[in-house]
Amino acid sequence: MFPKSNIDRNYKVKLISYDKKGKLVSDDSFEQVENYLFQNRSTTYKPGYIRRDFRRPTNFWNGYRCFNQPVGTFTRKLSDGGRQVADYGIVNPNKFTANSQHLGDNMVIYPGPFSINIDQRASVEVLNKLSQSNLNIGVAIAEAKMTASLLAKQSIALIRAYTAAKRGNWREVLSQLLISEHRFRAPAKDLGGRWLELQYGWLPLMSDLKAAYDLLTQTKLPAFMPLRVTRTVGGTHNYKVRNVESAGDTWSYRHRLSVNYRIWYFISDPRLAWASSLGLLNPLEIYWEKTPWSFVVDWFLPVGNLIEAMSNPLGLDIISGTKTWQLESKLNATLPASGWSGTAKLTAYAKAYDRSTFYSFPTPLPYVKSPLSGLHLANALALINQRLKR
């Protein structure tokens, strides 16, 4: 929850001198009031209705930061044989945002170049959620022969395994499931093949069957009923910067930055929207999915998602949309002092929220997706094993 008021704190800074016998010579310690918690937000207003039962979203931003002054003790020897003991001193809290790459002094988020990829990914993926189902008849027709051949082998194996299990013949069950020793001649190829059949045969088929059933059995939507889709994509940005006006210290930032797209829309042309959701209006989508090795490209650069997003808004009208950035920022720094022994620890924390509105569907742009996720890696290993064993 975002605070609604600032908080100041009274800090005591130690500066004590001792002679060579350890006797107190002077105490120049002082106290100073500094801001600990700073918050800022945009002014709000009550939005009006742009259509019956739908209230217009508004632009809004809000943010705060908590700045903990340095904690640590420093010592140094004096020319007369004495010594001094001191704290680091007061650091201007505004240096936290001055060194930050994503947060301004007024607590407004500046996404920066780091955010371009996650922004474009979120906009494409929210457009792909506009379809009422994942059913793609166009591709299914083109793949009918391959799918039938792929599933025939699995169907026979599973039916035989099921029949053997009912009769208590567990050796036959293991044999049909490729677990018995005499059927395990090429485990890498067999396991890879079964894994690929699961990923590209069974799972898409079951998804299409469920989507077809849902589409055919769902009740008809009322005319101009507001619908909504949402998608959030985030990333972590870690970096170090040399402190401005510093004596050589380095500040380490850890930012968690995310963007959320939310779109309210209605179906203006049911026939066009229906055809679009079935994948019948975009021949590029079918052509790409049938291109050899296109799935390898999609691991790094999801061209298929981009092509699909281009036609998904067909037959739909947007009512309104919002793009919301959220930022969580943490700072850690170790502060030295020239001529002194010792270090001080500096920590700070900030959180910010920034929502903007739009009234047209976002334009899909290419983005890069990490190929090192667990599912992508498993698919890659299975495909490599398949190719090597041929």
From Swiss-Prot:
One of its GO terms (cellular component) is virion component. GO terms for molecular function: RNA binding. The keyword Isomerase does not apply. Keywords: Host-virus interaction, RNA-binding, Viral attachment to host cell, Viral attachment to host cell pilus, Viral genome circularization, Viral penetration into host cytoplasm, Virion, Virus entry into host cell. Pfam families: Phage_mat-A. The keyword RNA-binding applies. It comes from the Viruses. One of its GO terms (biological process) is virion attachment to host cell pilus. Its main location: virion. Interacts with the host pilus. The maturation protein is required for the typical attachment of the phage to the side of the bacterial F-pili. Binds to sequences located toward each end of the genome, hence circularizing it. The RNA genome-maturation protein A complex is released from the capsid upon host receptor binding. Maturation protein A enters the cell along with the viral RNA. This is Maturation protein A. The lineage of its organism: Viruses, Riboviria, Orthornavirae, Lenarviricota, Leviviricetes.
